[in-house]
């Protein structure tokens, strides 16, 4: 290849690199949190909260079932709730 062709190719590659770096910066700016450990910890915290709420709800359903002299499964069926939800 001639020197001018190589220089032209280098110039095109530099432009492509700048475009890719710009795209990367745009993508990184859209991320709410770039720290994976922090994201995982937030998900774990949310799962703990979900489990606490679910446990309370199941306890309350158990109390209602006891009061109505039926099973929790019967209450789930009555209200159209899948027991695994």
Swiss-Prot record:
Interacts with sfr1 and rhp51 during DNA repair. Interacts with swi2 and rhp51 during mating-type switching. One of its GO terms (molecular function) is identical protein binding. The gene is swi5. GO terms for cellular component: mating-type region heterochromatin; nucleus; Swi5-Sfr1 complex; Swi5-Swi2 complex. Pfam families: Swi5. One of its GO terms (biological process) is mating type switching. Belongs to the SWI5/SAE3 family. PANTHER family: DNA REPAIR PROTEIN SWI5 HOMOLOG. InterPro entries: DNA-repair_Swi5. Required for normal mating-type switching. Also involved in the rhp51-dependent recombination DNA repair pathway. This is Mating-type switching protein swi5. Keywords: DNA damage, DNA repair.
